[in-house]
Amino acid sequence: MSMLSPEKPSEPAKIIDGKGIARALTDQVGREVAKFVEQGNTIPGLAVVLVGNDPASEVYVKNKAIQTHRVGMRSFMHMLPQSTSQDELLDLIAQLNANPKIHGILVQLPLPAQIDPVAVTNAIAPHKDVDGLGEVNAGRLSLGIDGIVPCTPLGCLMLLQSVHKDMTGMHAVVIGASNLVGKPMAQLLLKENCTVTVAHIHTRNTKELAREADILVVATGKSELVRGDWIKPGATVIDVGITRVPAENGKTRLVGDVAFDEAFPIAGHITPVPGGVGPMTIACLLHNTLQAARATQAVADASS
């Protein structure tokens, strides 16, 4: 079989409906929040902090607030100026850590140059770190201990589980080794008993590795990096990337890290961009916030 002309499966890929799966998860969270509150527990609260005035981030943060209210949670938005110092942000996080009405804290990335994102994520109390990026939750994940899992990798895993009930022994290749997606994704796949390969910017044979993948997760931020001849016939492809690129008539369009039109005839299952991984990220944020509220309540019940 030629590497340049991969054998095609008998039919095109099935689209993994991220919107539909995210909607079902959000609806489930809403029902569970209502039940949690009916039992006399505090309404779960999510605080989102945005530093700066990036329009895209503002839209994203406001969308999170809308979804938070939709499932019956409290939303606390903190919009800080671009000039905010690291100490000022850390002071706010300390206040949010101490606030019993807040069960989850998310600081929108990226942050201005004067603020160290590692210091900020580690300042969030581990039981309120609903993005799962602090060193405590990252350490728990690497050790296979239950903790809060980063939203995007968790969403990717749920999409994979909608296709594969058992991933034991499957070869999973993750392209991209970021702390945000690639590394935690690899840990989650290991927990599913996959054989995991991680490719990164210094990997010399990324294309060849991708061609061996039963499961291919791509999170590089490089638009349409993965072409059709990178895909193993019948593979499941999860495209985490999203980039706005020029289109005809002076317009723009959104594309992923995978050349969808080329991959679609080859893959067995594939996520679209948009409408694949993106909706799952916010749904998993709400899921994590409810889990954090439950954990906080369990500690309170045990100590009373």
UniProtKB/Swiss-Prot annotation:
GO biological process terms on file: L-histidine biosynthetic process; methionine biosynthetic process; purine nucleotide biosynthetic process; tetrahydrofolate interconversion
Listed GO CC annotations: cytosol
Summary of subunit composition and partner proteins: Homodimer.
Residues spanning the membrane: none
Entry's family note: Belongs to the tetrahydrofolate dehydrogenase/cyclohydrolase family.
GO terms, molecular function: methenyltetrahydrofolate cyclohydrolase activity; methylenetetrahydrofolate dehydrogenase (NADP+) activity
Function: Catalyzes the oxidation of 5,10-methylenetetrahydrofolate to 5,10-methenyltetrahydrofolate and then the hydrolysis of 5,10-methenyltetrahydrofolate to 10-formyltetrahydrofolate.
Name listed for the protein in its UniProt record: Bifunctional protein FolD
Organism annotation: Gluconobacter oxydans (strain 621H) (Gluconobacter suboxydans)
Catalysed transformations (reactions): (6R)-5,10-methylene-5,6,7,8-tetrahydrofolate + NADP(+) = (6R)-5,10-methenyltetrahydrofolate + NADPH; (6R)-5,10-methenyltetrahydrofolate + H2O = (6R)-10-formyltetrahydrofolate + H(+)
